[in-house]
Amino acid sequence: MTTHSPVVTVDGPSGAGKGTLCMLLAEKLGYNLLDSGAIYRVLALAAIHHGVDLNSEDALVPLAANLDVQFKAEGELVKVILEGEDVSAELRKEETGMAASKVAALPQVREALLRRQRAFSAQPGLIADGRDMGTVVFPNAEVKIFLDASAEERANRRMKQLQQKGLDVKFDRLLSEIQERDDRDRNRAVAPLRPAEDALVLDSTSMNIDEVVAQAITFIESKL
């Protein structure tokens, strides 16, 4: 085993199951957890709480650099703790998402958050969940996993999730939305969605979560 803090990155498209896999890996290994998809929402929420102008890079950069946030895997949920307060529910609000879009458009803020994300690497290790963790944020990570699944399977999983919440959704619409997002993510100019060259590509289309976790653990153990 390595004596420093190992980093395990898990990248992949929307709906592939990264969040669930990362939570289970963090729990099984006792590692720290980084949910990079939530980091801009967390910063936006911190700015709102502190009355910081969402268009001011000068004010947002120090806030991003010193962002006091923890991600805790609890059962099937990731609890997000901002400055000691559970803000998981607030993060899901539409206004938080809109504010996150504003701060994410500022280059210096993105750079500050990149450094802040790297600071999550600490003993005993880190599970980093995102889209460019293995290619941009932690290019030197010891273990890189790219979790994929067919667009049809991801749409089907999403439909089941929404139906369990009592929502009436159409499969074709969900599939179209996923395909459009895939296209945007894979063809964007900055940090396009792609597996790192040294990543294990796991296709979870016909696998259950236990099988995915087992393969991931085997790969992690072979690398550390």
Swiss-Prot record:
Gene Ontology CC: one annotated term: cytosol
Top-level taxon in the UniProt lineage: Bacteria
Keywords: ATP-binding, Cytoplasm, Kinase, Nucleotide-binding, Transferase
GO molecular function, one term: ATP binding
One family name in Pfam for this protein: Cytidylate_kin
Residues annotated for ATP binding in this entry: G12, P13, S14, G15, A16, G17, K18, G19, T20
Catalytic activity: CMP + ATP = CDP + ADP; dCMP + ATP = dCDP + ADP
EC class of the enzyme, as a word: transferase
EC number, as in UniProt: 2.7.4.25
InterPro entries xref list: Cytidylate_kin, Cytidylate_kinase_dom, P-loop_NTPase
One GO term (biological process): pyrimidine nucleotide metabolic process
Predominant location category: cytoplasm
Subcellular location: Cytoplasm
UniProt record similarity statement: Belongs to the cytidylate kinase family. Type 1 subfamily.
Entries under NCBIfam families matching the protein: cmk (TIGR00017)
Name of the protein this chain belongs to: Cytidylate kinase
Organism of provenance: Aliivibrio fischeri (strain ATCC 700601 / ES114) (Vibrio fischeri)
Gene name for this UniProt entry: cmk
